[in-house]
Amino acid sequence: LRYAEQIFQLGEQLPLAVREAASSQGVRLSVGISDGLPKPVARHLLLPATDTEGLHLLCSEGEFDDLLADLALHRLDVVLADRPAPVNPNLKVYSHALGEAALMWYASPALRALSDAAFPACLDQMPLLLPSRHAAVRARIDDWFDRKSLRPRVAGEFEDSALLATFGESGLGAFPATEWSHDELTGQRGLQLLGRCDEVVEHFYAISAERRVQHPLVQKVLGQ
């Protein structure tokens, strides 16, 4: 009798569960975000898809190579990264350039007060926080230091751009960020702009498992 009552209760609950599932259905977009990609950049790149009614956005962050493997296995709809996918005949993925953004340098007010030199010479007079060497932009930053004859003191290197900005806000060092992060850094975090570096830009890519993308939200991200 107890089992019969449980079956009856389940039968009553089933229509409600079906209705709830139906109401929660939406347009799903599963995105892999390379761990070298700054969070404000990821938000900016996904913005064209976020006005979709019923959007169900799934974002996962991970190592670039791991995300490409998941993409090839169709566990992800798209990967956002700061570099194109490497040429590999065994990996059927396709890179789409989304744009680029110049780097800008920031520091806490207290740190900025330590130097009255103009940008970029002021970078030689304060500790710096940099993206790790896993980030595609790091080599371009190092080359720029050489061209400008800068010999800065590196106080920290970070995989996570959000963590880098947090330590920068605390005054540990000056740091670079894309121009798309400017409002957040100067407004919410109260950092000061040291200067703009148009000679170093970050490039951004969407990587898909299809040459001709069929997913409507990935098409929006690509501007199609």
PLM region spans:
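Alpha-helical "hinge/linker" immediately C-terminal to small N-terminal DNA-binding modules
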Residues: 1-26
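Short amphipathic alpha-helical coupling segments at ligand-binding clamshell hinges
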Residues: 1-3, 41, 45, 140-141, ...
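Flexible hinge/capping segments at coil-to-helix
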Residues: 22-23, 92-133
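Central regulatory/effector-binding core of bacterial HTH transcription factors
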Residues: 26-87, 158
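Short, well-ordered beta-strand segments
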Residues: 28-32, 79, 129, 175, ...
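Hydrophobic hinge/microswitch elements
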Residues: 63-67, 72-75, 82, 136-192
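Short beta-strand->loop
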Residues: 93-104, 187-201
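A late-sequence structural motif
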Residues: 113-114, 192-224
